[in-house]
Amino acid sequence: MWASGSVKIPTHIAVIPDGNRRYAKKTGIDFYHAYKKGVEKVRNFLTWALEFRDIKNVTFFALSTENLQRSKIELEILFRIFEDELRRTLEDPLIHDNKVRVRFIGDRSLLPGKVVKYIDELESVTKNYSNYHLTIALGYGGRAEIVRCIKRVLSGEVRLETFSEEELFQCLDTRGIPNPEPDVVVRTGGEKRLSNFLLYQTAYSELIFLEKLWPEVEREDLVYIIEEYSRRQRRFGR
């Protein structure tokens, strides 16, 4: 597609897949089928990302702590879809053939037992994979993540006297994930904010906002993301 060395491909892409509910209203379909299409698009996006072998990490913001304040009916729809997708992913050739390690970040105590069961199983069956890394933020909030980290310090798990930026990374939900700082954060749906997503990890991430609603995203949009990222000069505050 590109001449060798002409494009700088990000190794870690984080995605805020916004716009499922607006897609339902726009197309006249119900929330269940809109969210179902949104979840299917996550798999599509991962498939496209794996075609670019330099993309090693993909992180999705699937459900925030704020999202948990939505109606009971909407949450039941979401959790039913999550259960179905997690169960299917346990035997997904896309994961196993490419040796994708799957991790989940967030507060699992906020999630239904069946969802947690499948999360644990999926993490277990992929724990020895290391070619690629897929991280799903579920029941996650960036501020809550930092609070959990502070509690670990106060409990004595980490020595306060030697506490450093690097040790803070080891307190966060993303500890153990190679390159936990996204090179680029992509948000669909036209909104231009992080919405409490990876607040510490995104200090120097490039931000790209797409007007398209998440279910409308296609492979050409990932190509645009890569090309736009390649045009940027990352200065890391210097």
From Swiss-Prot:
Reaction equations catalysed: geranylgeranyl diphosphate + 7 isopentenyl diphosphate = tri-trans,hepta-cis-undecaprenyl diphosphate + 7 diphosphate
Record: active site: 18, 67 (proton acceptor)
Cofactors named for this entry: Mg(2+)
GO terms assigned for molecular function: magnesium ion binding; prenyltransferase activity
Keyword Transcription on entry: no
The entry's keywords: Magnesium, Metal-binding, Transferase
Keyword Transmembrane tagged: no
Any GO BP: polyprenol biosynthetic process
Residues annotated to bind substrate: 19-22, 64-66, 70, 187, 193-195
Record text on subunit structure and interactions: Homodimer.
Function field: Catalyzes the sequential condensation of isopentenyl diphosphate (IPP) with geranylgeranyl diphosphate (GGPP) to yield (2Z,6Z,10Z,14Z,18Z,22Z,26Z,30E,34E,38E)-undecaprenyl diphosphate (tritrans,heptacis-UPP). It is probably the precursor of glycosyl carrier lipids.
Family classification: Belongs to the UPP synthase family.
Protein name in UniProt: Tritrans,polycis-undecaprenyl-diphosphate synthase (geranylgeranyl-diphosphate specific)
Species in which this protein is naturally found: Pyrobaculum aerophilum (strain ATCC 51768 / DSM 7523 / JCM 9630 / CIP 104966 / NBRC 100827 / IM2)
